[in-house]
């Protein structure tokens, strides 16, 4: 029977440790770590995600500062808000909720975030440092996936990892992190021909493509480790990017959907904010 890589249970364990660290930081410095969240526009799903991150802050004893901007906000206005947060010594992490309205240059705004406060790992500078093996906060979802693999003693070095998806905040940093952990990495994407043939070679498969159940169960190599970073609402629940029904009969380990990667994305963001506060208040 396959090992279930339970992200919810691991997130609770990490949050318990973070609560202790935050209390110690408060006792030592008299300050509380603060994550600033910026929500632009009225996207319902984005508002839900921001609320979940605020709840996670409270669970570990942190504060969150919620900045809400109108749908008509310009790039210049958003950059001005980010610069205020960069300059605010009480703010230790900055999250710009993706996506932003179409008129905004999202990349310019991501890159305006101070490296010391880039706890969601979205800046080009942070990505470049991470890809070169230097210290930087990792993009939250792939960094959370790496924690899941390491905490469950999944062997990475020397394994063939196939990442399906090449987005700037998931697929590309995921591949870089696996490479840094000494995996042999293949990146597949929308232009990849014969996708199934690549997936069938994978010791570790990461679904990060954003298409419901694109990766079929019968493509999975027996004994592979299956990581599904997708979520697509369906019939009161949801499915991921990988066809998981019956996967326990094929894989050696897998992340469920929901309850696998998702909880660890938020917990990683919170953990990196605590780390940023510890550095700032040392």
Swiss-Prot record:
It catalyses: (6R)-5,10-methylene-5,6,7,8-tetrahydrofolate + NADP(+) = (6R)-5,10-methenyltetrahydrofolate + NADPH; (6R)-5,10-methenyltetrahydrofolate + H2O = (6R)-10-formyltetrahydrofolate + H(+). InterPro entries: Aminoacid_DH-like_N_sf (IPR046346), NAD(P)-bd_dom_sf (IPR036291), THF_DH/CycHdrlase (IPR000672), THF_DH/CycHdrlase_cat_dom (IPR020630), THF_DH/CycHdrlase_CS (IPR020867), THF_DH/CycHdrlase_NAD-bd_dom (IPR020631). GO terms for biological process: L-histidine biosynthetic process; methionine biosynthetic process; purine nucleotide biosynthetic process; tetrahydrofolate interconversion. Its EC number is 1.5.1.5, 3.5.4.9. GO terms for molecular function: methenyltetrahydrofolate cyclohydrolase activity; methylenetetrahydrofolate dehydrogenase (NADP+) activity. The keyword Oxidoreductase applies. Pfam families: THF_DHG_CYH, THF_DHG_CYH_C. The keyword Transmembrane helix does not apply. GO terms for cellular component: cytosol. Keywords: Amino-acid biosynthesis, Histidine biosynthesis, Hydrolase, Methionine biosynthesis, Multifunctional enzyme, NADP, One-carbon metabolism, Oxidoreductase, Purine biosynthesis. NADP(+) binds at residues 165-167, 190. CDD domains: NAD_bind_m-THF_DH_Cyclohyd. Pathway: One-carbon metabolism; tetrahydrofolate interconversion. Catalyzes the oxidation of 5,10-methylenetetrahydrofolate to 5,10-methenyltetrahydrofolate and then the hydrolysis of 5,10-methenyltetrahydrofolate to 10-formyltetrahydrofolate. Homodimer. Belongs to the tetrahydrofolate dehydrogenase/cyclohydrolase family. This is Bifunctional protein FolD 2.
């Amino acid at each position: 029977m396959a090992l279930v890589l339970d992200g919810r249970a691991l997130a609770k364990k990490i949050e318990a440790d973070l609560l202790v660290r935050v209390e110690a930081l408060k006792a030592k410095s008299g300050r509380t770590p603060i994550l600033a969240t910026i929500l632009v526009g009225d996207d319902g799903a984005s508002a839900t995600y921001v609320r979940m991150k605020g709840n996670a802050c409270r669970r570990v004893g942190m504060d969150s500062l919620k900045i809400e901007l109108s749908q008509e906000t310009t790039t210049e206005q958003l950059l001005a808000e980010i610069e205020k947060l960069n300059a605010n010594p009480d703010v230790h992490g900055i999250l710009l909720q993706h996506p932003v309205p179409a008129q905004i240059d999202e990349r310019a705004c991501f890159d305006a975030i101070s490296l010391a406060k880039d706890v969601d790992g979205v800046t080009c500078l942070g990505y470049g440092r991470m890809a070169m093996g230097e210290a930087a906060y990792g993009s939250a979802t792939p960094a959370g996936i790496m924690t899941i693999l390491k905490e469950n003693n999944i062997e990475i070095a020397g394994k063939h990892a196939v990442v399906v998806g090449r987005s700037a905040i998931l697929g590309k940093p995921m591949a870089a992190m696996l490479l840094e952990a000494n995996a042999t990495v293949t990146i597949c994407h929308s232009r990849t021909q014969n996708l199934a043939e690549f997936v069938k070679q994978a010791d570790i498969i990461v679904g990060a493509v954003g298409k419901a159940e694109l990766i079929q169960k019968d493509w999975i190599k027996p004994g592979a480790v299956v990581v599904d970073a997708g979520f697509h609402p369906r019939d009161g629940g949801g499915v991921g990017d990988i066809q998981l029904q019956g996967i326990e009969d094929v894989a050696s380990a897998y992340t469920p959907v929901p309850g696998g990667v998702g909880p660890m994305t938020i917990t990683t963001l919170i953990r990196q904010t605590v780390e940023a506060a510890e550095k700032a208040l040392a």
